[in-house]
Design a protein with these regions (language model features):
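Alpha-helix-loop-beta-strand connector modules within alpha/beta enzyme cores
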Residues: 56-77, 110-122, 182-193, 276-280
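Glycine-rich, proline-tolerant flexible connector loops at the mouths of alpha/beta enzymes
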Residues: 25, 30-31, 42-66, 96-104, ...
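Catalytic alpha/beta core domains of metabolic enzymes, predominantly
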Residues: 126-127, 135-284
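Hydrophobic faces of well-ordered beta-strands that scaffold small-molecule active sites
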Residues: 18-24, 47-51, 73-77, 95-97, ...
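N-terminal amphipathic alpha-helix/helix-capping segment at the start of soluble metabolic enzymes
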Residues: 1-23, 116, 278
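Glycine-enriched alpha-helix->loop->beta-strand junction motifs that scaffold or abut catalytic
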Residues: 68-71, 88-95, 116-119, 186-192, ...
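Hydrophobic or amphipathic alpha-helical targeting/insertion segments
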Residues: 82-123
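Active-site mouth loops of central-metabolism enzymes
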Residues: 15-33, 52-54, 71-79, 135-148, ...
Length: 344
């Protein structure tokens, strides 16, 4: 089991539920735009939000952002450890750094002392595109072994400073390399792991890459917090991550299953299923709901769900806990939602 760290009240590692993260893409100096996006991400299910802190103007905005944010904030820092210290002094709950780009051991010690003072963890975020030159030369390019070595080298530097609240991430653009790196890290250390595929791309292919990479790791029991990285607005990211967790049984909620439809389909399966998903997006009650188009597979699939709707030429049939409950000839969606509302 991994170690446990506390990010502003959200626990990561040590058997805690897998949390969902995302990152703002607003100008962090613009309070109104940034807090609006943070709130929207939280509304979409995000547990922790990261934002880029690239100058002193960003730091000055952090106190108000941290005070008004509904979720803990993480400062993403590059090159200047003083910005990390300023961010911690202004209320962020965690800092993310890249290995090797905040200076030598003196700077690392100053950061470690500040992290201890504020009881905040740090993430050492290794990306395949920014590995140190000596690591690239040693391994002949980007490899899982090199990514893990980079992360552990800098984790040990922090531990020599007496600081151990460390999270690692080992993200590559290549799904196989990402999975290989996390599997290797899980064998050689007990740091909590933030998992994801970096620069996965636009929605669609990006979701697919993330689902394969994150899903493969979570099935292995690897991963304590996740981010689905998508090009464009970050608002779809939390939902995509939550869908992965729900598919693996790691997050409770309404699981809507529906048939792919064929010429036997008697009802608007896609329309009903989509409306049910939208209506139950925020529901935490574990419930499996089946929307099936006809009487061939419909009754059988519906019997495996808590609630099911199977279409027929005259309307549809509702199933509850595997048993045929009643025939429906009116609004099929509302009939199904009435049953759902009784159980949530």
């Amino acid at each position: 089991m991994t170690r446990r760290v506390n990010v502003g009240g959200v626990l990561i590692g040590g058997g805690a539920p897998v949390s969902v993260q995302s990152m703002t893409n607003t100008d962090s100096r613009d309070f109104e735009a940034t807090i609006t996006q943070i709130r929207a991400l939280a509304e979409n299910g995000c547990d922790i939000v990261r934002l880029a802190v690239h100058d002193e103007a960003c730091v000055r905005t952090l106190r108000r952002l941290a005070d008004e944010s509904p979720v803990p904030l993480v400062a993403d820092i590059h090159f200047n450890h003083k910005l990390a210290i300023g961010a911690l002094e202004n209320g962020v709950a965690k800092v993310r750094i890249n290995p090797g780009n905040i200076g030598g051991e003196k700077n690392v010690r100053e950061l470690a002392d500040c992290l201890k003072t504020h009881h905040a963890p740090v993430r050492i975020g290794v990306n395949s595109g920014s590995l140190e030159k000596d690591v690239l030369n040693k391994y002949g390019g980007v490899t899982a072994e090199g990514m893990v070595e980079s992360a552990l080298t800098h984790a040990r530097m922090l531990e020599r400073c007496g600081f151990e609240d460390i999270v690692l991430s080992l993200k590559a653009t290549d799904v196989r390399k990402t999975v290989e790196a996390y599997r290797l890290a899980s064998r050689v250390c007990d740091y909590p792991l933030h998992v994801g595929v970096t620069e996965a791309g636009t929605p669609g292919m990006g979701n697919t890459k993330s689902a394969i990479g994150i899903g493969a790791l979570l099935l292995d029991g690897i991963g304590d917090t996740v981010r689905v990285s998508l090009t464009g607005s970050p608002l779809p990211e939390p939902e995509a991550a939550i869908e992965i967790l729900r598919a693996l049984g790691l997050r409770a909620g309404v699981d809507v299953i529906s048939c792919p439809t064929c010429s036997r389909t008697c009802i608007d399966v896609a329309g009903i299923a989509k409306r049910v998903q939208e209506a139950t997006r925020q529901v935490k009650t574990p419930l499996r709901v089946a929307v099936m188009g006809c009487v061939v597979n419909g009754p059988g699939e519906a019997r495996e769900a808590d609630l099911g709707l199977a279409g027929s030429k005259t309307g549809g049939a509702l199933f509850v806990k595997g048993g045929r409950a009643r025939e429906v000839k009116g609004d099929l969606y509302e009939a199904l939602m009435d049953e759902i509302r009784k159980r949530i």
